[in-house]
A protein has these predicted regions:
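Alpha/beta catalytic cores of nucleotide-metabolism and tRNA/nucleoside-modifying enzymes
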Residues: 5-8, 93-115, 119-158
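Conserved, mostly hydrophobic/aromatic
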Residues: 45, 67, 75, 98, ...
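Alpha-helix-loop-beta-strand connector modules within alpha/beta enzyme cores
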Residues: 35-53, 86-113
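Active-site entrance/lid segments in N-terminal catalytic domains of soluble metabolic enzymes
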Residues: 1-65, 69, 81-84
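Glycine-rich, proline-tolerant flexible connector loops at the mouths of alpha/beta enzymes
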Residues: 26, 79-89, 143-147
């Protein structure tokens, strides 16, 4: 990965010979992630914006329930296409479990629920909507179509 402001990310760890250069880009990118964020920070986000706040990357029903309890407007159930953690449930399974739990608690109309990851065709979109998703994020099929066939490929994919 390259950034126009940083020419060689392999030196993020310093210039000494013992530095592990194999994680340069990953280490540089992770420096932008605030690991101290927690559920209590949602109140601060609410104080600085009137825009709806959604939480992306939800992978468990319990976290979806917490997002609702902390007043988030919606969530995006996502496992990053399964390429980050291959042992987690697919978003469509988490969606089914979450919507069932929300319906049981009469909370299913209080939060928008999107899914992202693992969606490859129109039938996946229909299944997600039928299971209660507000919307579906689709990336990879359109990225491949665009990179291979350009605008025509995206039109055909749609």
């Amino acid at each position: 990965m390259r950034s126009k402001n940083i020419q060689d990310l392999s030196h993020v760890q310093g210039d000494d010979e013992d530095a592990d250069r194999s994680q340069g880009a990953a280490r540089a990118i992770s420096s932008f992630i605030d690991t101290s964020l927690n559920w209590n920070d949602i109140a601060w986000f609410r104080s600085i914006t009137k825009m709806p706040i959604l939480l992306k990357g939800v992978q468990r029903v319990e976290d979806g329930i917490l997002a609702l309890k902390y007043g988030l407007d919606g969530i995006v159930i996502s496992n990053h296409g399964g390429r980050q953690l291959d042992l987690v449930k697919p978003p469509i399974e988490v969606l089914a479990e979450l919507q069932s739990t929300l319906r049981m608690r009469k909370m299913d109309k209080k939060m928008e629920v999107f899914i992202d990851g693992g969606v490859r065709r129109g039938s996946d979109v229909i299944k997600a909507i039928a299971l209660g998703a507000t919307g579906v994020g689709i990336g990879r099929p359109f990225l491949y179509a665009m990179s291979t066939y350009g605008d025509h490929g995206v039109s055909k994919a749609i």
